[in-house]
Amino acid sequence: MRNTCVRFGAAAATAALVVFLAVIGTTARAGNQRNRLFFANSTGVAESYFASGGMDTRNEFFHGLGTNGRSCSSCHQPNEGWTVTPQGIQERFEKSAGKDPIFRPVDGAVCPTADVSTVEARRNAYKLLLTRGLIRVAMPVPPGAEFQLISVDDPYSCTNASDVAMFRRPLPAANLRFLSTVMWDGRESPKGRSLRDNLMSQAADAVMGHAQGAVVPTTQQLESIVAFESAIYAAQVADSKAGALGQAGVHGGPEALSQQDFYIGINDPLGLNPTGAAFDSTVFRLYEKWNSGGTMPAWSPARQSIARGEQIFNTRPIPISGVSGLNDELGEPVIMGT
């Protein structure tokens, strides 16, 4: 699998993808799979690369540790970038009549008390999950909050004056080494705690909350989950118009990503790099060799477009102002970013 290359012709792109993925599918059924999985998407092929050497479906990540049939993989699907998409969720609804483990009232419905007694009732109860891929999380206003909850407008009649209901799509369980905070709001990242411990805490909370666990998962189970997800790197590996994104001198794809240096403060534009290294505004050099289109004429326009996008990201000036914790802390009304 390591040397597999996908090439696209304008007329044969769909057929090539079908054949390519069919081959992958026949090799991906054992308990301990190879270290690469490929999935077609609307613009080409995405790849999941496992730095640990393989996707072991015997891992606790795939086991239901709670009481409602859910596992981590219920909301973190390999073929959907290790999150979920409305399209994938809708397909699961139709196949299961809305009884797949992702469809649980505790947080999949617009309200935990929503009617799920019939297929149509479930379709209505899970409409935000079906149409937007959103999970409901209700949390109280934290002590010392810098805001007040003064009004509630809830079309589902499910929020009270002390809790805030938030609908969020599950974050990808991939590329986790690059996180500076865990969860949308960073609540799993208290000051001074390591990323590993943050992910352990997040996994435990997911089991007890989303999976409605009756028993707190063991340290061994949590370590198993975190070790697995920490080894996953996911990225687009081939484009239907530009071809392979990680060959012939360019460096896209998840394997290259797995080799990327990273630490908190790396290449910091405000001078906070712990090594003291100066900021380099040329953040990305993945596709420099495509500035001229490369050596494949049929793909040159798309490749040059990708290279231009990289240049824009690196060089287009963006004035940053009015950001609490940044402009005020530094005493700079405007900070130029790119």
Which ranges hold each PLM region?
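Bacterial N-terminal signal peptides
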Residues: 12-23
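Periplasmic c-type cytochrome electron-transfer domains
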Residues: 28-338
